[in-house]
Amino acid sequence: MTSLEDNSQLQPEHSTTSFQPPCCRHTHTSDTHEPWRSLLHNAAPKEHIVQLYQDEQFLNRAVCRFAAAALAHGEGVILVPTAAHWEAFCPRLEAEGVDLSAALSQGQLTVVDADELLPRFMGEKMPDAPVFLGLAGEVVARARSRDRYPKVRWWGEMVNVLWERGNATASMALEDLFDQLAHEQEIAIFCSFLMDNFNGEVHTRMLPRLGQNHSHLIPVEDYFRLESAVADALREVVGPVEASVLEKKLLEQYAPPFAMPSSQALLFALRQVVPGVADAVLQRSGTLYRAS
């Protein structure tokens, strides 16, 4: 991993081929079940996307999809991982056709250690907004390489580091700053949280807050399995007739706080409108999703 002053340390020693725009060759899984792949592939400036994950392979696939697509599009890419995750990303990126040494040396890819950058703008418990925006602006300016790569994407997990430390307040304050950064710098931002989408506390406290500073939610890896699990769980909990009426009514009348799969929006709506059955449907949905 590297400091802000030196990106060269990240170049893999074993990669010697000349740089070619990376492509996502390994696309055996249909985007029908995983629309998040298209969302990340085509991430646009000012979009702020959040992923919930428990499986490290899901994290790796999503981040490398986001980064490899940007490199293929001729965009600058900023990654701010922990050292352990950067080590896991490298072989995946190379398998997708990315020449890491060339991407780093040419300035198209900028990688900064999350554990190195985070203390530089954190106060006692909360992020210092002016310091963060100044440091982040420096990273974005580097990624643009004097307008060689005017379009830039950023993925990072400093917000998750704070979340895993138990400092949810600071994590959400930092997300607010990232949302500000996305709009001021006109970049796409993607972040990932180690959260269980079928946890009641996450649905009650964290997802509504994430809806205040994100444009899109990626709640699970397989949207088709989620849709099936939620539909079956709702039928089991309230009965098939009531489930049909309730689903139609909620999806028509309730607008989720940010873009998400319709089945996820249904879980949101249940908690807002019929809280008495929300936890039962959520827990059963999780059981069915994991078993499918």
Residue ranges and their predicted role:
Residues 2-292:
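Non-catalytic regulatory/interaction regions at protein termini and inter-domain linkers
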